[in-house]
Amino acid sequence: MSNILILDFGSQYTNVLAKKIRLLSVFCEVLTWNTPLEKILQISPSGLIFSGGPHSVYQENSPKVDKEIYNSNIPILGVCYGMQLIARDFGSEVQGGKSEFGYTPIVFYPSELFKGLVDQDAFHTEIRMSHCDSVVIPPKDFFVIASSQHCPIAAIECPEKKLFGLQFHPEVSDSQAVGDKILSNFVKHICQASETWKIETIEKQLIQSIKEKVGETERVLLGLSGGVDSSVLAVLLHNALGDRLSCVFVDTGLLRKNEVEEVKQQFSSLGLEILVVDASEKFFHDLSGIEDPEQKRKVIGAAFIEVFDEVSRNLDVQWLAQGTIYSDVIESAKSCDATQVIKSHHNVGGLPEKLNLKLLEPLRFLFKDEVRALGKVLGLPDVLISRHPFPGPGLGVRVLGEVRREYVEIVKNADSIFIEELKKANLYHKVSQAFAVFLPCKSVAVKGDCRHYGYTIALRAIESTDFMTACWPSLSREFLNRCSSRIINEIPEVCRVVYDISDKPPATIEWE
């Protein structure tokens, strides 16, 4: 298959870059920066991209590539750190200079990379910069094709070797129109990659892969959450394995309001029988006294595995299926040893090393929008496909600090009110995700002319195309007032409601 290969040097945007390329209907995969040249040549990609990263190329032991890769005749695009690496490998100097962050005016000059953007002499626009180091002089046989005020060498090219470098990130949403055009030029025009990445093809490949991996006799256990990922996975596995799939829904006590009954009803309508296991006592017991978010995630992951192990002995299953997707992997920083860890994901970083079941993750390299598209192909109803994401640890990471039953009930009711109001106002499908967070701090209020000491609820809503970057929506004063009034009046323990106005980055979507 004609494809684009990304060598990951640790950028948190690497998988956003991969998604952008897949949206061009071109297959893209990500490998670590130290992948042997022999393996890269065996893959025989149409093009290579060196990602950004947190290191400086002049640091000792900074990530490097085998320089023979430049003699492979494979077109290469370096992004940020990737551009600096190319420049250094060809004899240029990279220095820590004037940093640039945020929107920056830039000038593009004629280049194959900017085809359709630069008609004649130059094209003036704004892109988002995020760098501390800069290339001082262009390498021999390279030309400068973009400049900004504080970064005279913002992009370079060597047409003869088909080598290109960008000091900025074309994949981030802020510069979407320009960035998408640049990536399209590189992938389709320069690399001439084939458009073979289609969701219908993915469905067939995944079903075939599941059959080959599981074999003809072994059985699979799937822990349903009621979310998009596990719902799509359930139908996919059912199509591949039939009655050799056992679906278990674990009531952790950390679920959304009425979640258990809704999940039972939804999957019954899909022709799937599920076993409901009430393990809430265990989860609250195991979480008692634990305040650290990372530890909570690991405890919840371990508790899930213990429950599944116990169930599996009665069901005679050999595999545990999980709805892990690509963004889960990048959040847990497992795709590259140079990545800065943000948080562990329940499905990937929170699992104990010793697992008594073999792990099956068919959706591991699909993005959320690809999972939704797959769900449509599989015939899932819109009510499941368009549901907001819900974290694997559930409300355990929406109660800050120690998880107690009374705290969970408070945030569960507040969340239900918030979602209900979003649906009433026809806003639910206009935001990408929305939820309530319980803050374990009390503040003074006045209720019925009496002094009251109550908890605080934070409301969080975001708009995002990839869940790697996100912005907060400007919900109206009237809408937020309705939500606040209902929460404070209907939940006696709460006396204050705040609205989170933090983008990602710097904040993550979930508070923990």
Curated annotation (Swiss-Prot):
Annotated EC: 6.3.5.2
Pfam families in the record: GATase, GMP_synt_C, NAD_synthase
* Catalytically driven reaction(s): XMP + L-glutamine + ATP + H2O = GMP + L-glutamate + AMP + diphosphate + 2 H(+)
UniProt GO cellular component terms = cytosol
Q: Which residue ranges does the record assign to the Glutamine amidotransferase type-1 domain?
A: 3-196
Q: Which residues form a coiled coil?
A: none
EC class (word): ligase
Q: What are the binding positions for ATP in this chain?
A: S225, G226, G227, V228, D229, S230, S231
Q: What does this protein do?
A: Catalyzes the synthesis of GMP from XMP.
The name this protein goes by in its record: GMP synthase [glutamine-hydrolyzing]
